[in-house]
Every structure is written in structure tokens, then in C-alpha cells.
From Swiss-Prot:
Entry's family note: Belongs to the RRM Spen family.
Pfam family, one: RRM_1
UniProt biased composition (Low complexity): 10-20, 95-110, 123-132, 222-233
The organism of origin for this protein: Mus musculus (Mouse)
Any one Gene Ontology BP term: regulation of alternative mRNA splicing, via spliceosome
UniProt subunit comment: Component of the WMM complex, a N6-methyltransferase complex composed of a catalytic subcomplex, named MAC, and of an associated subcomplex, named MACOM. The MAC subcomplex is composed of METTL3 and METTL14. The MACOM subcomplex is composed of WTAP, ZC3H13, CBLL1/HAKAI, VIRMA, and, in some cases of RBM15 (RBM15 or RBM15B). May interact with NCOR2. Interacts with NXF1, the interaction is required to promote mRNA export.
Main subcellular location: nucleus
Region: Disordered, residue numbers: 1-132, 215-249, 549-703
Keywords: Isopeptide bond, mRNA processing, mRNA splicing, Nucleus, Phosphoprotein, Repeat, RNA-binding, Transcription, Transcription regulation, Ubl conjugation
Gene assigned in the entry: Rbm15b
Name of this protein: Putative RNA-binding protein 15B
Record keyword Transcription present: yes
Residue numbers carrying Phosphoserine: 107, 111, 261, 263, 549, 553, 559
An example Gene Ontology CC term for this record: RNA N6-methyladenosine methyltransferase complex
Length: 887
């Protein structure tokens, strides 16, 4: 009764009286709504306004005044929600029940927003977009599952590295099977590589490959951060969109995990629930994405999309420390490799890491059992190679353990490697930016290269430049410098690619060919990997073909044409005309047979003399007509004991030519009428004999020096004896590289007896720090030219020079090889020091110091001649510096 009286006294009594019939009316209206929906589907045109008009007072009665307060602001949302959520057979009532919170008595909530429009300037992804979206990653599929991973990586790396800096990773997906991700540094490089792959069918081991770009979603971090809060208000999904082969490819779990690491933890939703705030929300999303950490995002774009093959479960590939080299002040070309297996070898480490660059040094440390795992230090040629290896190999399993990789200590020198240069960077720009730190000695840079070497006069200037210029923008807004120390006397190219010395059968390339940008980059990365045996000739021709852009390919063709022209010109100078060039190979074979036959005592005709006669033409025939019977008899006498159809050997030809020359001199005075013709004939004969001498010179060399021991035998022996360290002695031979012999004989002798010293005991060590090395250099300059000597110390052999004077090893000393002493000094990073003379001296008239340096940057400056002769120094050696004290 009370409720009935309240209903009677309410202003809307009629409307509220009808609310008692609400359950039955709902059933009838639901049935009527179903009939209306069916009628509408069959072509009816009944207007749905009365249904919405009846819903409005019912909503106000159920929701109260709060619903009325929001009715004006949310009318558009309710109308759009009712239309979008209505389904056939359910009518508008079903849409109202599912979209209107007031029907259930709960607090009202705004209906979900449609997806906001893209921000101004954003590029839509997909094939239907007007502007092509950018991508840095290519997905390579249809790979053969039977090929080894290393060979597959090498072949793909060789195909795509010519387009720019890349990193490559193999993976496996359930849909595509074996795939590879090729990540480029710049989007234009990736686009150029894909265009070439589409222009011509890419084959690998007779198998066509499929190349597709991988687009990264714009603003992905903000969408992911707000996905949890908007999950409840997401509208029902529409029909599935057609497959987009060029859209964003869903990758495996490891990649999604890395993408999630870019978003801030527990980030609040940034979008306002109003359509009019969509543009502002996108601006906030962009600001939030920029604040997440651009260095990590750039590292992910450059080296991302790596699979988890070979990594332990749960390993996070992209962590806080994976900064780009220009952002990481700790980045050096030295890598620390931890958690290694005790049985790991240097060959295994080189095989695993050499694909990322040139490794100069590998040092493996194996602590005792129970004191930790083994670890190693790898020194790459430059910082780019080291960073590429660090990112790609972190967490990979070598042996049985997943390795840990970090940067090692830097080795400061006066020479800097500067990377990250743009193609238009000039020497003047480098000099202008780096000259402010100190005096520059040299700048080694070829226009178009992405790196340069800068040599300073002092170590302090190099250290200041390395610290201040790392990350400096030079060459454009998107390029920043990478700076690291390099070898003090390092040449521009690695030793294995030095143009000299070359074997006899190699040809030197022209300057335009060797300094071409793309070919230069090929030399720097990893052209040392041999092609696989399954790699057919047709594939090799395709891979070594022209895969660059039109401008680059034209440059390469020009350089190749210049190179071929130079080779043809050299060949023409060497072999004469085309007819001579066609018989060059038989001459080579006959020359080899001639060298063998001369050793056996048989003489054959010299092809070079025959060629000179043929090459001379008419002059040669005149020379033949001038031959007197007396000269013919002398020639026949010089070739006595041979067959008539045979010919003279090279030595006999020279001997005959000398006799003929002597014969001309003998008859020149009495026969003055023929003097001019005789002198001309003599010049021709001298030309004839000079050519075989020139071509025969390599044969008369003793032999090509191949080892450091052979090179040392060409030097003067300075001292031979035993170097003693603690309880070990090392037989050593010292050969003079430069300096005064008197310093050696004056300081390396026993003063009481006056005899030569046979033992030198190392009692001190000198740390290989730059200030101490500068002090040694200063003492050498003060003692020049007669106050110092530099010697090359190698292992003394029983059959070597001075071996007969080797002293007998004293009791208690263990004879060991010199390489053990070198390894000890390398490990200590020090040089051995001996005060001279041994035993001390009463005065300072004849005193000095001996420094024994292991192979290091300081010692290499005295072995440049050996490096030019041998190419590389593989034997263990030391450089001995003896300096006499100055008053």
C-alpha cells in the first residue's frame, strides 16, 4: 500500500503504473522486436524511433537522475552502440540489453569508442596504403632444411651485405618452416635489397627463395600498455580481414617478448574515453614511446628479430646493457667471453665468432678446478665487428654452456678508429672536429667509406678525443660517431688483405678497384669464408654478379673495365701481340721443363731468345745476315755436345752472347767500316741477354723467406746465449735490427774477465704502460745514433748461427723454449728489464739498460721490414732494446 501510494503521488503516475507490467511487457516487446527484425530483413521499412522513445522513460525510471544527467552527453554513444550491437534476430532490444548498463541496475558506463583515426602524417601499413611504410627487416623463407646453419648464414650474409650494415639470424616457425631474418641499419638499404630480390628470382642452392618485409607497428608500446584497461570495453570483433602478405607478420614468442620489453612497466592508459581526444592521445602515445628509451629501441630495430635458438630458456636477448656503440662509453673492440667450457679451444671460438669480423687475438684463461669457469678475451679489428658479435652471440651455447659476453678493457693508443661516417664525410670535416684535442699526425680516410683512422701525436690527445667524440653527430642528423682505439701502427686494411707481398701468380689491382666502397666493405667484413661444396657454378656467378643499385653498379663496371684494361695493357707489355699471348702458356710449360732439364745437365733452346728474334722483326733478320762464319763457329763451339735440332739453355745463351760481345769488341778496331752496324748489333745482343736475366731473376734468388727464423738469418748476429728467468733458461739468438754494434759488445760483456756474457738474468719487469714506453723512446732518442741497439730475439736452434758457442746449462736451471718466456711476459703485460753491465759497475761511464719486449704495439714499429717481407709474424719472438746511459 505504501508503494502504491508513492506511485499515485509521483508526477509520472501513468508511466509508473505501467512499470508493474514490466516483465510481461518485456516478453511481448522482445517477441515484437524479433518480428520487426525479421520484417526488416525481408524488406520492411518500419522506423525504429518508437522503440527508442519507449526505452527512454524506462531507462530514466531504472537509472534515476544519474542517468538523466548523462543522457545529453552520451546520446550519440547510445545511438551508435544500439545500432552497432543489434544483431539479426535480436532486434534493438537485444542491443540495448547488451550495451546499456542501466538495464541491469549497475552504474552506467559509456559505450566503447571506435578505433581512433591515425595521427596526421602517419603512414598506414598494408598494401592499400598510399605511402609505403618503412621497414628494416626482411623475412627470407623457403629455405632448405637440409643445409647446415653456418653455410646458410654465410651465403645469405654474402648476398645481402652489399646493401649496407646487416645482422642475420636463422629461426623456425610452424607456418613457414625454416626462415631467416635480415636486419638492416637503414630502411632504404632494406628497401633496395627487396627491390633487387623482386626484380630477379633469388636462388640459393637451386632453390627459389621468398623475400618479404617485416613491418613494425607504429605506437605499439602505447597500444600494449593500454590493452589491459580497454579489454572489457572492446567491441565484438568483426569479420576476419583478408590475409595481408605485406602487413605485420606475427612472429614467434621470443620476438614478442622482446617487443614487450620496450613498453614501460604498469604504464597507465593514456587514451581518454572521448573521440574528440583521439589526436591528443596519439600525441601522448608518441611522447611515451620516445621516453621509453630510444637506445634500446634502436638496438632492437638494428639487431632485433633474433630467435632463441641456442639460448637458455627465459634468456632476455635485448637487455638494458645492449646499447649502440655510440651510446655506450664502455664499448671497445675487446670482448670478454665468460662461462666457457674448460675444454673449449681457440679454434672453436674463432669458428663461432669469425663470421662477424676479423679476430686479431684470442686469449683463453682456464682457472683451476673449483675456482670458476674458463673465460676468454677476443680482440676484433674494430668496434663495429665487436658489437655485432656481442649482440648476436650473447647467450649462445658453445660447447655445453651458454656464454656471457661483455666488453673488455680498452688499450689506449695514439691511433683512433672512427666509425659511423656518412658517405659525404670529408677529410676537412674530420680534421676540423678532431684537431681541437691535439696535434694530428695523419688521417687515413677514403671518401665513401664509413670509417677512418686518425693518428695523434700524443696519447692524452687520443684519449680525450675518444672520450668526447663518441656519439658526436657528424655527417647527418641520423649518424653519430663510434670511436675506439686502434693499433698504433695499424695499416688501413687487415694484414691478410694487404696488397704486398703477393705470391708470384697474383695480380695487383688498380687503385680504383681496391678502393671502391662496396668492394672495400666486402674486404672488411668476411670474404674469407670459403664457398660451400654444394654451391654450384651457376649460383656462384649469380651471387658474385651485380646486385647493387644502378649507380653503384655503373661505378663497379667502370672500375672493372679499368682493371681489365690495365691487366690487358700489362699483358700486352709482357707478351707482345695477340699471337704471342696465345702461346704464353706453352712458354711457361717449356720454361718449367727447361729449369728441370738444366738441373739434369740437358740443354734446351731458350724460348726468350727465340721470342726476341721474332719480336725484333726486320732487325733480327739483318742481325742474322751479319753473322760471320767465325761467329757461327764460336756459337757452335759454345753449344758443343748438344743435338743439332736442340737449342742452347739460358745460361749457355748468356755465355754465347758474352763471347759474341767479346768477339765484336775484338774486331771493332780493324773493321771500322762495319763499326756502326757492329755497335747496333751489340746493343741488340745486350737487349737480348738483358731480357732473360730480368725474367730469370726470381729463379736466382736463394728462396722466398717464409718464416721469421729465415728472415733473422739475413741479419747480423748480435748475441747468442741464455736468458734466465727464475729457475728457467731460454736459449736465445739476437740479431741486429738497427743501432750500433759497439753498444752490444761494450755492455754485454763480463768486465772482470773481459769475456762475452753467455747468460742474462731478468730480474725486473717494466709495465707496458704508455708513459713508461714513452720514457724508453726518449732514452733511445737521447742515445742516437751510437748509444742504442735494437735486436730481434728468436729461439736458438742447435744448427743455427752461433750455436757452437752456446753455454752449458747450470745445475738447477731448466731449459725451456723461448715461447714460454714470451707467453709469460704477454700474460703479465710487461717487458723484462736487465741492468747492464751484469754485476754492476764502479762508474757510470759504461752502464745501460736492456729491455726485452714481447710482441706488442711498441715492438712492432721495429719490425716493419719483416712485416713487409713475410706478411705476418707467426713465430714467437721478442724485440730487445739496449740503451746506454748518458751523462
Amino acid at each position: 500500500m505504501k508503494r502504491q501510494s508513492e506511485r499515485d503521488s509521483s508526477p509520472s503516475g501513468r508511466g509508473s503504473s505501467s512499470s508493474a507490467k514490466r516483465p510481461r511487457e518485456r516478453e511481448r516487446e522482445a517477441e515484437a522486436g524479433g518480428r520487426r527484425a525479421a520484417h526488416k530483413a525481408s524488406g520492411g521499412t518500419k522506423h525504429p524511433v518508437p522503440a527508442r522513445a519507449r526505452d527512454k522513460p524506462r531507462g530514466s525510471g531504472g537509472g534515476g537522475g544519474h542517468r538523466d544527467g548523462r543522457a545529453a552527453g552520451d546520446a550519440n554513444h547510445r545511438a551508435s552502440g544500439g545500432r552497432s550491437s543489434g544483431a539479426p534476430g535480436g532486434g534493438g532490444r537485444t542491443g540495448k540489453a547488451s550495451g546499456d548498463p542501466g538495464a541491469g541496475g549497475a552504474s552506467p558506463r559509456a559505450s566503447p569508442l571506435p578505433p581512433p583515426p591515425p595521427p596526421p602524417g602517419a603512414e598506414p601499413a598494408g598494401p592499400g596504403s598510399t605511402a609505403a611504410p618503412e621497414y628494416k627487416t626482411l623475412l627470407i623463407s623457403s629455405l632448405s632444411p637440409a643445409l647446415p646453419a653456418e653455410h646458410l648464414e654465410d651465403r645469405l650474409f654474402h648476398q645481402f651485405k652489399r646493401f649496407g650494415e646487416i645482422s642475420l639470424r636463422l629461426s623456425h616457425t610452424p607456418e613457414l618452416g625454416r626462415v631467416a631474418y635480415v636486419n638492416f641499419r637503414h630502411p632504404q638499404d632494406a628497401r633496395e635489397a627487396r627491390q633487387h630480390a623482386l626484380a630477379r628470382q633469388l636462388l640459393l642452392y637451386d632453390r627459389p627463395l621468398k623475400v618479404e618485409p617485416v613491418y613494425l607497428r607504429g605506437g605499439g608500446s602505447s597500444r600494449r600498455s593500454s590493452s589491459s584497461s580497454a579489454a572489457a570495453s572492446t567491441p565484438p570483433p568483426g569479420p576476419p580481414a583478408p590475409a595481408d602478405p605485406l602487413g605485420y607478420l606475427p612472429l614467434h614468442g621470443g620476438y614478442q617478448y622482446k617487443q614487450r620489453s620496450l613498453s614501460p612497466v604498469a604504464a597507465p592508459p593514456l587514451r581518454e574515453p572521448r573521440a574528440r581526444h583521439a589526436a591528443a592521445a596519439f600525441a601522448l602515445d608518441a611522447a611515451a614511446a620516445a621516453a621509453v628509451g630510444l637506445s634500446r629501441e634502436r638496438a632492437l630495430d638494428y639487431y632485433g628479430l633474433y630467435d632463441d635458438r641456442g639460448r637458455p630458456y627465459g634468456y632476455q636477448a635485448v637487455c638494458e646493457e645492449d646499447l649502440m656503440p655510440e651510446d655506450d662509453q664502455r664499448a671497445t673492440r675487446n670482448l670478454f667471453i665468460g662461462n666457457l667450457d674448460h675444454s673449449v679451444s681457440e679454434v672453436e671460438l674463432r669458428r663461432a665468432f669469425e663470421k662477424y669480423g676479423i679476430i686479431e687475438e684470442v686469449v683463453i684463461k682456464r682457472p683451476a678446478r673449483g675456482q670458476g669457469g674458463a673465460y676468454a678475451f677476443l680482440k676484433f679489428q674494430n668496434l663495429d665487428m665487436a658489437h655485432r658479435a656481442k649482440v648476436a652471440m650473447s647467450g649462445r651455447v658453445i660447447g655445453r654452456n651458454p656464454i656471457k659476453i661483455g666488453y673488455g678493457k680498452a688499450n689506449p693508443t695514439t691511433r683512433l678508429w672512427v666509425g659511423g661516417l656518412g658517405p659525404n664525410t670529408s677529410l676537412a670535416a674530420l680534421a676540423r672536429e678532431f684537431d681541437r684535442f691535439g696535434s694530428i699526425r695523419t688521417i687515413d680516410h677514403v671518401k665513401g667509406d664509413s670509417f677512418a683512422y686518425i693518428q695523434y701525436e700524443s696519447l692524452d690527445a687520443a684519449q680525450a678525443a675518444c672520450a668526447k667524440m663518441r656519439g658526436f653527430p657528424l655527417g647527418g642528423p641520423d649518424r653519430r660517431l663510434r670511436v675506439d682505439f686502434a693499433k698504433a701502427e695499424e695499416t688501413r686494411y687487415p694484414q691478410q688483405y694487404q696488397p704486398s707481398p703477393l705470391p708470384v701468380h697474383y695480380e695487383l689491382l688498380t687503385d680504383g678497384y681496391t678502393r671502391h666502397r662496396n668492394l672495400d666493405a666486402d674486404l672488411r667484413v668476411r670474404d674469407r669464408t670459403p664457398p660451400h661444396l654444394l654451391y654450384s657454378d651457376r649460383d656462384r656467378t649469380f651471387l658474385e654478379g651485380d646486385w647493387t643499385s644502378l649507380s653503384k653498379s655503373s661505378d663497379r663496371r667502370n672500375s672493372l673495365e679499368g682493371y681489365s684494361r690495365s691487366v690487358r695493357s700489362r699483358s700486352g707489355e709482357r707478351w707482345g701481340g695477340d699471337g704471342d699471348r696465345s702461346i704464353a702458356k706453352p712458354w711457361e710449360e717449356r720454361r718449367k721443363r727447361r729449369s728441370l732439364s738444366s738441373d739434369r745437365g740437358r740443354t734446351t733452346h731458350s724460348p726468350y731468345e727465340e721470342r726476341s728474334r721474332t719480336k725484333g722483326g726486320g732487325q733480327q733478320s739483318e742481325r742474322g745476315s751479319d753473322r760471320t762464319p767465325e761467329r757461327s763457329r764460336k756459337e757452335n763451339h759454345s753449344s758443343e755436345g748438344t743435338k743439332e735440332s736442340g737449342s742452347n739453355s739460358l745460361s749457355n745463351s748468356r755465355h754465347g752472347a758474352e763471347e759474341r760481345s767479346h768477339h765484336h769488341h775484338h774486331h771493332e778496331a780493324p773493321d771500322s767500316s762495319h763499326g756502326k752496324k757492329t755497335r747496333e748489333s751489340e746493343r741488340n745482343h745486350r737487349t737480348t741477354e738483358a731480357e732473360p736475366k730480368t725474367l730469370e731473376e726470381p729463379k736466382h734468388e736463394t728462396k722466398k723467406l717464409k718464416t721469421l727464423s729465415e728472415y733473422a738469418q739475413t741479419l747480423q748476429l748480435g748475441w747468442n746465449g741464455l736468458l734466465v728467468l727464475k729457475n728457467s733458461c731460454f736459449p736465445t739468438s739476437m740479431h741486429i735490427l738497427e743501432g750500433d754494434q759497439g753498444v752490444i759488445s761494450g755492455l754485454l760483456k763480463d768486465h772482470p774477465s773481459g769475456s762475452k756474457l753467455t747468460q742474462l738474468k731478468i730480474a725486473q719487469r717494466l709495465r707496458l704502460d704508455q708513459p713508461k714506453l714513452d720514457e724508453v723512446t726518449r732514452r733511445i732518442k737521447q742515445g742516437s745514433p751510437n748509444g742504442y741497439a735494437v735486436l730481434l730475439a728468436i729461439q736458438s736452434t742447435p744448427s743455427g748461427p752461433g750455436a757452437e758457442g752456446m753455454p752449458v746449462v747450470e745445475p738447477g736451471l731448466q731449459r725451456r723454449l723461448l715461447r714460454n718466456l714470451v707467453s709469460y711476459l704477454k700474460q703479465k703485460q710487461a717487458a723484462g728489464v736487465i741492468s747492464l753491465p751484469v754485476g754492476g759497475s764502479k762508474g757510470r761511464d759504461n752502464t745501460g739498460m736492456l729491455y726485452a719486449f714481447p710482441p706488442c704495439d711498441f715492438s712492432q714499429q721495429y719490425l716493419q721490414s719483416a712485416l713487409r717481407t713475410l706478411g705476418k709474424l707467426e713465430e714467437e719472438h721478442m724485440v730487445i732494446v739496449i740503451v746506454r746511459d748518458t751523462a
